[in-house]
C-alpha cells in the first residue's frame, strides 16, 4: 500500500525510517503511539491514514507536546479532516489529485470556469475533476473501437491511454490498468487546504 511505496521511495532517496507503528482503523486513543514517536524524535511523521485517525493523532500530538511536521496521502484530502483536527492540523501537508486554484492546463481552467458557471462556485474537490477524467477517457477509448459497445475492446483501449489531456493533468494508463499522473501537495492554513506544489511522475 501507500506506506510501503513511501518507504521504498524514501529510502531510495537517502531517507531513514526511524520507527514504523501500525494502528487499527477505528482506534481513538493514540497517546501511547504519540509517546513512542516522541522518544524517536523523527524529523517528520508520515501518516498513510484516513481523516478520522489522522486528525486524532494530530490533536493528541499537540496535547502531548509533539510538534513535528505531518504528511499524509489523499485519505485526508477533505474539509472534514481539517474541521476535526482544528488548530492541530495547521501546517499539515497531504497529496491530492487536483487543485481548482491552480489548473494545470487550459482544458483544466476551462473546466473550472464551466463548473463555476453551472454551480455558481469555482470551488470543487478532486473527485469532480477525476469524474470528468474518467468519463472522457472512457469516451476516448470507445471512439478508438470499431464497435464502441464492445467491452473487451474498450478495456484494451483504456489500458493504451497515453498522455491523455485530462482535467487533472496528463494521464497514462498501463496494461495493468494503473494510472501514472501528476499529484499536487496541499497544506492546511487557517482552516483551509491551500495549494503548495505540483509533483510530476
Where are these regions (language model features)?
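Extracytosolic ligand-binding ectodomains
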Residues: 1-201
